[in-house]
Amino acid sequence: MQTLLDTAHCRLTLYRYPRQLQDPLQAWDAADEYLINTLAEEPLERDGPVIIMNDGFGALAAYLHGHAPVSVTDSHISEQATLANLAENGLDPHAIRLQDALASLPDAPALVVIKVSKYQALLEQQLLALRQVATPATRVIAAGKAKDIHSSTLALFEKYLGPTRTSLAWKKARLIHCTPVATPTERPALANPFPTVWPLEGTDMLIHNHANVFSRTSLDIGARFMLDNLPIHSARKVIDLGCGNGVLGLSLLARDAEVEVTFIDESHMAVASARLNVEHNLPAALPRTHFLVNNCLDGVAVGSVDRILCNPPFHQLQAITDHIAWQMFSDAHRVLPKGGELWIVGNRHLDYHNKLKRLFANAQVVASNSKFVILKAIKR
């Protein structure tokens, strides 16, 4: 496991979060290195706020620590990784400000550094937010995998900010340089396309999705399969783990006037979407709900829930990994009381059946089709 980011301009020890003993994935990528090298060679020349967007595990926050940056992310995991890696390198975590991706940005930033993901909706939302604060003196520099930077990516920068150019590729990463045109008050107003709203078929409910929520414009097929096979007998207290827009928990609230649902996700936008969907569709059910941005079930009391519903992700940022699903299952086993149930939906090829058997010593197939399987495990 490579943990030392050692360049001509910095030497940092960095870990992914949660830290694992045998983690084959490192906590930075070539785009981080490219940004660090470029910022070192072209240092900041004016005072003003420094904004970092989508810093995966804190490499950029650690490098720019001396500028007291505002680190903007939708990911609770990224926030915790940033704090842990700052401490790992003897840097004061209180010198930076962590901010979720829905909060307002500081005015007139001197520098904005963006990690570009392959999901353009989040980038568009962030560029729209930057449009409200960036000035012609703001330096905007972004980086990502070269394969994820397309003409449509550059078009977004030009639409919301101003003239844009790209760098040569380096280690399969590429930079984007953008020069904002005009001041926020001089720019014409543009419509905000977020959150997106679509009808949940078979109901009179409207589903709201913020920019970084999976399957923004329709019900994803895994969730659809789970909705078709939700448990007939309700539990008193249920957790919708990895809730996304909250459609599973929302459906439980709609059909059972007694159930209490806790919506948990590591994405701020996911939990905000779940809350918005309950507020819009079932406002009377709000007293029976809780909303938590969290790393799986960290801090959730043992025996505090009767059933957990879960549609596990199999990637962290852009890396494919099964450790998140394993942590979700392990946390569920810890939190559930005897007789408590974990219900999951997943792709058939992911072998969740054997993982559940290792933890719970049982796993029952509730339903399956050519692509998905729904499994139930009971705490003995």
Curated annotation (Swiss-Prot):
GO function term, MF aspect, one: 23S rRNA (guanine(1835)-N(2))-methyltransferase activity
Record InterPro entries: DNA_methylase_N6_adenine_CS, rRNA_m2G-MeTrfase_RlmG, RsmC/RlmG, SAM-dependent_MTases_sf, Small_mtfrase_dom
Keyword Oxidoreductase: no
Catalytic activity entry: guanosine(1835) in 23S rRNA + S-adenosyl-L-methionine = N(2)-methylguanosine(1835) in 23S rRNA + S-adenosyl-L-homocysteine + H(+)
GO CC annotation terms, alphabetical: cytoplasm
Keyword Manganese applies: no
Top EC class for this record: transferase
Superkingdom in the source lineage: Bacteria
Key words of the record: Cytoplasm, Methyltransferase, rRNA processing, S-adenosyl-L-methionine, Transferase
Chief site of localization: cytoplasm
EC numbers on record: 2.1.1.174
The protein's role, per its UniProt record: Specifically methylates the guanine in position 1835 (m2G1835) of 23S rRNA.
PANTHER family: RIBOSOMAL RNA LARGE SUBUNIT METHYLTRANSFERASE G, RIBOSOMAL RNA SMALL SUBUNIT METHYLTRANSFERASE C
HAMAP family: 23SrRNA_methyltr_G
Name by which UniProt lists this protein: Ribosomal RNA large subunit methyltransferase G
